[in-house]
Amino acid sequence: MEKSGYGNDGIYRSLRPPVLFPNDPNLSVTSYLFQRSDAYPDRLALADANSGETLNFAQFKAMVQRVSHGLSRLGIKKGDVVLIFSPNSIYFPVCFLAIVALGAVVTTGNPQYTSAEITKQANDSKPKLVITVPQLWDKVNHLGLPAVFLGSKISGDGTIAPSNRNINGTVTYFSNLVELGGHVSEFPPVSIKRSDIAALLYSSGTSGTSKGVILTHRNLISTACMTTSDQEFDGEDPNVFLCFLPMSHVFGLVIICYSQLMRGNSVVSVEKFDLEMVLRSVGKYRVTYLCVVPPVMIALAKQNWGKIYDLSSLKRIICGSAPLGKEVIEECAKNYPHVPIIQGYGLTESCGIASLEIPEGVREYGSSGILFPAVEAKIVHVENLTPLPPNQLGEIWIRGPNMMQGYLNNPQATKLTIDEQGWVHTGDLGYFNGEGRLSVVDRIKELIKCKGFQVAPAELEGLLLSHQEILDAVVIPYPDAEAGEVPIAYVVRALSSTLDEEAVKKFIAEQVAPFKRLRKVTFVNSVPKSASGKILRRELIAKVRSKI
């Protein structure tokens, strides 16, 4: 094997030390976490920066046990799907672990989703129960599902939660759910195998329809072992992670919450991103690891916040979701010289991880680091599919124990993404250098990455074409300093139409989450297409960028 990790078989292998994975076939996500935590019952597990509430590991375990029994008494059983549609709180991971302890399956919804978006996901995943908050109830009430409301009967903004006359179905408040669970000291007796499904996390596809990524207990346990391996090899003391990234997303739920709690680290929950609250919380809770997305890095680069807030506890800033510009990294390094900035690469289909930089040694701008232990990769020629050696650009394929089992109810998409040898075809273009560092340079997929979220152009195009005065439309990414990319549209109007830009923007804004809203609309006579009718999206992107 070369210094790059490249072998004669065309496969790149991890240069990190190997990880020992648990081999008990009957291990669940929940049992694995708590069999380890019994050694440190008094250590802080979860803190809520918004409410000030805290749970040590003993309290955390007891609450998960009670909630799992409570859910069982509500009729949730092995194989059932439960939707968590809520902002971040310490009760999000409690509910997640309680659900999977029953052998049931968690699916999550971004709180920014519209009613139509969450309905599509519910129609696909068919949940038996929704766990939400009063402020989001109007978006899911029509589903007619029994619900659990997190928090007290007074909602977070001081208003009374919806009364029964507004509720279509049965609502149980979280405090009542805990009481329903009773005073128990064991988890419900359910037979769970590592091969059982634990989570359905939705990932946008280029088809414009969001797809349920099937992740097993083995996937999540393996990911946790891999994610925390650097801390273990370096012999680090227990760390404190701040989680303001949505727990509805693989980064927040699996990489931060589950993986770090599994190691015995503490997780501080922030309901939603507010830079000054995040920075205050770093000092208050002595946060050592800060996980961010590029827009937050840009905010950190603009000002030396360390002069205003106590950031002395920080040991690492980890940035995922999209590559960072050289200027942003340099400014952050200048502002926070004691904190290495670590970039990584992953996707929902790989439980959020594939590669990560190592803080020590020479840094390379734009690199996403080296492969995690047990992850293999290929760089494949996009036309003839032959494996490529270092410093040659091709599609990134990855394989490992963290890779999804497929897409829910979508065998065709599964077959296109995972081949018979278990390789996940990422749709991303990249290359490894001679030292085994991966650089991701473009996406074959046409997803737009806006503020760390995925936006499918085809979804927005479908909505545009549903307007009776729009004949044709194309949506492309446009570079943005704050968001990374934003969606913009080129629209062909009907001859008699008087539509203007604001009307089109409003039409879309009323139907989608804020991060999917169009930032610009340009009216054109035609959309560039190939002879077969396929939109020539890349040509349009290149043309637009040449004018920037």
Swiss-Prot record:
Its EC number is: 6.2.1.-
The UniProt entry, under InterPro entries, shows: AMP-bd_C, AMP-bd_C_sf, AMP-binding_CS, AMP-dep_synth/lig_dom, ANL_N_sf
Fetch the Pfam families from UniProt: AMP-binding, AMP-binding_C
Q: In which tissues is it expressed?
A: Mostly expressed in immature green fruits, and, to a lower extent, in leaves and flowers.
GO CC, sorted alphabetically, is: peroxisome
Q: Which residues form the signal peptide?
A: none
Going by the UniProt record, its keywords in alphabetical order are: ATP-binding, Ligase, Nucleotide-binding, Peroxisome
Q: Which cofactor does it need?
A: Mg(2+)
Q: Which domain of life is it from?
A: Eukaryota
* Consequences of knocking out this gene: Strongly reduced piperine content in fruits.
- The residues the record assigns to binding CoA are K272, K451, G452
Top class in the EC scheme: ligase
GO molecular function list: ATP binding; CoA-ligase activity; long-chain fatty acid-CoA ligase activity
Region of interest (SBD1), residue spans: 274-343
Task: Locate the residues binding ATP.
Answer: 203-207, 211, 343-344, 348, 428, 440-443, 534
Q: Which reaction does it catalyse?
A: a carboxylate + ATP + CoA = an acyl-CoA + AMP + diphosphate; (E,E)-piperate + ATP + CoA = (E,E)-piperoyl-CoA + AMP + diphosphate; (E,E)-piperate + ATP + H(+) = (E,E)-piperoyl-AMP + diphosphate; (E,E)-piperoyl-AMP + CoA = (E,E)-piperoyl-CoA + AMP + H(+)
SUPFAM superfamilies referenced in this protein's UniProt entry, alphabetically:
Acetyl-CoA synthetase-like (SSF56801)
**Region: SBD2, residue numbers:** 344-407
User: What is this protein's function?
Assistant: Involved in the biosynthesis of aromatic piperamides natural products such as piperine (1-piperoyl-piperidine), the pungent principle contributing, together with several terpenoids, to the aromatic properties of black pepper fruits, and displaying numerous pharmacological activities such as antiproliferative, antitumor, antiangiogenesis, antioxidant, antidiabetic, antiobesity, cardioprotective, antimicrobial, antiaging, and immunomodulatory effects. Acts as a carboxylate--CoA ligase that catalyzes exclusively the formation of piperoyl--CoA from piperic acid and CoA.
* Name this protein carries in UniProt: Piperic acid--CoA ligase
Query: Which species is listed as the source?
Result: Piper nigrum
